[in-house]
A protein has these predicted regions:
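Short glycine/proline-enriched turns and hinge-like loops at secondary-structure junctions
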Residues: 49-50, 67-69, 110-113
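A cross-kingdom feature marking solvent-exposed beta-strand/loop segments within repeated
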Residues: 55-57, 61-66, 89-92, 103-105
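Conserved hydrophobic/aromatic beta-strand scaffold that supports enzyme active sites
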Residues: 39-41, 52-56, 73, 97-99
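A short hydrophobic beta-strand segment most commonly corresponding to one strand
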Residues: 99, 112-129
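Glycine- and acidic-residue-biased ligand/ion/polar-headgroup-sensing regions
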Residues: 59-60, 65-87
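Residue-level recognition of well-ordered beta-strand positions that form the cores
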Residues: 54-56, 80-82, 120
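A short, N-terminal "cap"/entry segment at the start of jelly-roll beta-barrel domains
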Residues: 1-49, 133-138, 142-162
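Short acidic-glycine-tyrosine-enriched beta hairpin
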Residues: 46, 73, 82-106, 110-111
Length: 162
């Protein structure tokens, strides 16, 4: 460690997770609210509510309608997704990046084949039931809890968390 780094933060002991993680080593964690959906937890902030995960949807899985309370962006890593919003239907293939703005309601995300997405949630997402009432809310605190339960070290939001 450099002399300036030691003077800035003498307690800093690099662990190797400061800026990245090998997601191949992370376990898939089931999301009880959505049958056929599991995640790999990577990062979650208790301060901002943001969290980053890799989502796996089994073939044929449809995520319930949801309201993205703070927006999100996603990159389809593998598979094929059908995204429905009102009367519009989009087919997403690997390499497709998308953004959903805050307070947007999405009618459905359906995996035509087993699919994996890298998703950055800027805050909580509210999953809706068939009557379009909130059935469950997924937050950064849920991600932190799941990571702790499965022994996953999350990438810190700041170097102070290292």
């Amino acid at each position: 460690m450099s002399q300036s780094a030691e003077q800035f933060n003498p307690d800093f002991q690099p662990t190797g997770i400061e800026g990245g993680v090998d997601t191949n080593l992370l376990p898939w964690i089931a999301i009880e609210a959505v049958d056929g959906m599991s995640i790999k937890t990577m990062r979650a902030s208790g301060e901002t509510g943001a969290f980053s995960v890799i989502i796996k949807l089994d073939s044929g899985t449809t995520m319930p309608a949801a309201v993205y309370l703070s927006g999100m962006d996603m990159l389809l890593l593998s598979g094929r997704i059908r995204y429905t919003q009102g009367e519009q239907v989009s087919l997403l293939n690997p390499g497709t990046w998308g953004y959903i703005s805050a307070n947007s309601k999405v009618a459905g995300i359906h995996a035509e084949t087993e699919s994996e997405l890298l998703v950055n949630f800027y805050g909580a997402v509210a999953f809706l039931d068939r009557q379009h009432a909130v059935s469950t809310i997924l937050t950064s605190l849920d991600i932190m809890r799941k990571a702790l339960e499965h022994g996953v070290a999350l990438v810190p939001s700041t170097l102070a968390g290292c």
